[in-house]
């Protein structure tokens, strides 16, 4: 009886027999490698060209292209993907928006490139992701601060004008109760505008990781989804949360700096709450995997956790407790903890 399965030599164990029939990864040939490099460079350039229009979504395409281009390659592939992405990003941004958005494009491209490179080369650590998000946040705020100061205004005035414009355009079709809610939302947006920058930066980081993971799968590189269950923030996040709470409590005792202290404390608490909520959801996913919960019910569980976080901050409380209690029994050297260790891929 004919069979399409390859012939396995005698004397192999069951484990080596499986590896002989279905290898974990396939090394590309010379022609296939060039094709993959060209495809990755083109996709990375396309994503970079539109980085100013949609920095979060474009980071998926950029990281995907970079992962495809440099997967299994060396310095030449990294240089080609980085230079092409930067050039395409600068040219595309200049043609669409002029020079104003070029610095933000460069930041998005560099972030997506570095995270994709770190993922493909198995160098990512959990702490590095948060450092990347914090760095991108500070750079974005710095860019807008310099830009507004060159125009004779401030970043606070810029945010206020944008919020007022959005509120004014939405006022016309609302009743009195809706207008009151909208004005309250305006006050919240004015107080938490730094958190908006952090949310955008975190979106760039997460989408870059997703693009790199998808690109690695496309190139038949060994990948794993265990990073979702191994997400573990550094202890300094809990310390920052405590500092933010302390700043909010000390605000009334510092009359000269009450408004600034309260604003800084509120934004530190909100940013760390977002990060801790992700850890709480990761604990939930880990627990559901241990219990072999079906995908449908796991999805409903995550959606419920998001709702409970928005209503009662429950997920962030679970994440904060996990930082101390280590429910998943993970190694506590978080800055050296790999999200996707090679031994588990």
Question: What does each model-found stretch correspond to?
Answer:
Residues 4-18, 28, 261-345:
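Long, positively charged, glycine-interspersed low-complexity recognition regions
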